[in-house]
């Protein structure tokens, strides 16, 4: 006996609200119904439906989803053995206090001595005409700070170029003052035995201006009769490079505008017109913040402002000088970036604001350098400043990057030069992702730097241009794999904790350190704080798993159990302990969007779905008797959970919020129902019609609007109006979430009979285009929408936590759908590793 074909639905394992046809027929000679999907068929036991039960229930059709990867026994076994002890809590408080003090002490920049620059300052003769140094304390510093091997420089970090340069400067100075014979002899011996090592060292290890100043000093040493190996072929090559470089420098350029040549004037003394060069002097009296260059100019001109600058620096450091000073903008920007990337910035909000206010007060539309009065901007500081200032709401234009682009569209560190390094290109790349609509310069910067950085990954030498970092390769790999819209705060913190080097150094004219940027205190706090937060998250996750089981959802055999993966979402971005309730509500609401997604996708008949929707609208538990058993479990769990949430919401908001929650869900279920009706009718909507509904059915708005009640702030009507479904901010969140979902799931779903996706709807509107062209269009719409989302995030004048809720929810979708359906297939994808690193694996 045959029965009419029934049409129901089966979800392919994605969270998209789409359907495929499943035809049911009797199996010949069997009491089973055969579910025929394409060429295949599976048998499931048939059970007579009771009154009001649905032939579409899971007793007829059981969808197969991959099981949840994170088992109960694993979650239950979490005892938070790494919980922060009382002593560690005290240590956290101490570290926070010490780092706050570091921020408060930021003045012109903390850095280490430069033996090279100190040697140049020590050359200055007494102003009274006597045969003595004007700064005898600097000569004494040189005498007292020779290293055991006979060299001068940073003892813990050896670069042949750096040590040879500093040693040559010191032995010349001591020779000029006819002192330190023993030190000079040891220095010469070091030079003779170690100079050859420069030949084996990468060119990228060469200090700034080395090929200018080193040959000039070598010539001076020869005149002084110092016994050095002048005939070494490598030394001759350096001299030849200097001559070639000087020939390429037009004389008019040297005096026309400030360039990095001002940093190395001590090596250009035979060609500089000292009267002309004075017009390029910085306001603070220096020449590009370089004590060595400024000392050379003073000895040639006697300029009082030069001397004032040197006195200013020595007043700060006592008996030595650094390789450049001040470093105030550089220090503040990198310190802010450090605490943000390590995930500890919430402890230093006031300090961060003060630092950024300072930087912004010295912002220039041509760009900035490492110091506020530095006349030569660089792309490194400028890009870092543009990104951080923009994300903190300061009004800065991306046009500032045009200063550093040449006629070929390439970006370089300094105007008019061809130098660039991995660290500065990495900062430009990070900056380029924080773009607004229409900012073509940001897109150009992104393409240029991505190309450069990918090439750099294949070239070991490329990683040592401006900074020697613990794992710059790891930083580059992370940035390329997880750009801004795919990088969550906890994941970035975890990665940077592993890559951050508390002993990192930079390379200017010499090797130098920045203790307020590279500091063990930052790392220690980041580790303690990460593990503390993780232990809180583990307890919350255990509670949520118990909620899932006590609600009877383990009996639902048509849906996905993804409590852990879903909890990972809020834990990855609103991770702070004070947002515990927000994470709980976010997770519970998200779980219901998955359950109801699966229910409306495949399990319920259209009549049953309308009954469920009506029950929610009326908030009427009595209608549950008319529902199939599986739907009863859904509604009772839904009803009880959101009544409890509404009760807690009333306490946090000071007013009844049940009606608000009901209205949020009413809109959500209407969107689900519309898609069910489209599927039933095999209707493919237009692209715009599809997007209007699908941006709601993706359910991100529902999750955010309900979770927002539990951020610790009272939601005024004004704030609600700025994040409700009519706001562009929320619409963009839903739109980008929907589009990234579709781009990764449409092919599989189409093969299962799906009729509508953004790609298919666009192809319906444009019958002549190919699928590839339609997909490209969808990606373009998504990328443009993400740029608009950036602008909304930066410019939206609502409390920070609400901005984060909306923006980070959009970003987590980009992460989940990087490779495919990261929710349904999380056990096969990197999401599994992200969950483990965020929730289970403490940092060591």
Curated annotation (Swiss-Prot):
It catalyses: (2E,6E,10E)-geranylgeranyl diphosphate = (+)-copalyl diphosphate; (+)-copalyl diphosphate = abieta-7,13-diene + diphosphate; (+)-copalyl diphosphate = neoabietadiene + diphosphate; (+)-copalyl diphosphate = abieta-8(14),12-diene + diphosphate. Substrate binds at residues 245, 465. Transmembrane segments: none annotated. GO terms for biological process: diterpenoid biosynthetic process. Disulfide bonds: none annotated. Its cofactor is Mg(2+). Keywords: Chloroplast, Isomerase, Lyase, Magnesium, Metal-binding, Multifunctional enzyme, Plastid, Transit peptide. Mg(2+) 2 binds at residues 597, 601. InterPro entries: Isoprenoid_synthase_dom_sf, Terpene_cyclase-like_1_C, Terpene_cyclase_plant_C1, Terpene_synth_N, Terpene_synth_N_sf, Terpene_synthase-like, Terpene_synthase_metal-bd, Terpenoid_cyclase/PrenylTrfase. Monomer. SUPFAM superfamilies: Terpenoid cyclases/Protein prenyltransferases, Terpenoid synthases. Mg(2+) 1 binds at residues 597, 601. It holds the Pfam family Terpene_synth. Its main location: plastid. Mg(2+) 3 binds at residues 741, 745, 749. This is Bifunctional abietadiene synthase, chloroplastic. A motif (DDXXD motif) lies at residues 597-601. It comes from the Eukaryota.
